[in-house]
């Protein structure tokens, strides 16, 4: 998902930096909790320092991990600005920056947090140029989830044609990308979801089979779907697969992996 931020038509004084010419605002929290703790506040940021760039955001990515930061499941020092992913335009750069220039369209993901803002300072060497033909909204919505899917399918276990894989949360952000990608690689995807609506979405994204997460014996169902062979890889982001280690091993093919 993504949200829009920023004003692409803002006219800046030639004698003032962007950070000084605009009221920069950010979604911040001063305590952990539900959505009610989110505050849209004015913030002061400096001009970019050594190796840094000032980014005017045009779109921000929304990720499930943001709720972990907001609720304190992953505790961080307060107060803080939320958000791990955004796209925008480079407004100015600090000393020693050579990879990006003012006016470049870029996207980023990762620490430090602070993507829920109209503009921010960010390490220039972590900025990714947005190719022509890719919108800022698409870039902001898929970078973190796309990189995660890439790592799962190409590094954790290199999926190949003929493989069968078990994918949890198959209708989520990462799952939607991973299901399509795995099918493109020639794999058969068994998706695990929690609702009928998500089941339809999982099938639409490339899952050949769907298992509901309240299934009493997912491992047995996997064995039945694979003719007793098991899957090449289990991608379990929910840690719901099975508490029975013997069942788990029996539904993963020889040499397969649980990730």
Question: Each predicted region: which residue ranges?
Answer:
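Conserved small/polar residues in nucleotide/adenosyl-binding loops
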Residues: 241-248
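Hydrophobic alpha-helical segments, chiefly the membrane-spanning helices
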Residues: 253-259
């Amino acid at each position: 998902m993504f949200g829009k931020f920023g004003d692409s038509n803002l006219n800046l004084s030639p004698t003032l930096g962007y950070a000084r010419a605009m009221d920069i605002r950010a979604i911040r929290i001063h305590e952990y909790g539900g959505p009610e703790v989110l505050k849209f506040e004015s913030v002061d940021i400096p001009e970019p320092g050594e190796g840094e760039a000032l980014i005017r955001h045009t779109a921000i990515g929304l990720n499930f991990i943001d709720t972990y930061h907001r609720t304190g499941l992953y505790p961080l020092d307060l107060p803080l600005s939320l958000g791990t992913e955004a796209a925008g335009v480079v407004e100015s750069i600090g000393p020693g920056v050579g990879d990006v220039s003012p006016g470049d369209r870029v996207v980023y993901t990762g620490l430090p947090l602070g993507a829920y803002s109209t503009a921010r300072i960010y390490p220039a060497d972590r900025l990714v140029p947005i190719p022509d033909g890719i919108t800022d909204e698409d870039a902001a919505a898929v970078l973190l989830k796309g990189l995660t899917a890439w790592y799962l399918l190409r590094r954790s276990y290199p999926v190949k044609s003929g493989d069968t894989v078990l994918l949890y949360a198959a209708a989520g952000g990462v799952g939607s990308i991973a299901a399509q990608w795995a099918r493109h690689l020639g794999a058969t995807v068994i998706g695990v979801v929690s609702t009928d609506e998500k089941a339809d979405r999982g099938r639409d994204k490339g899952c050949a089979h769907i298992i509901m997460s309240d299934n009493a014996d997912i491992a047995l169902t996997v064995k039945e779907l694979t003719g007793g062979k098991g899957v090449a890889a289990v991608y379990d982001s929910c840690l719901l697969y099975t508490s029975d280690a013997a069942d788990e091993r029996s539904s993963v093919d020889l040499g397969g992996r649980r990730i």
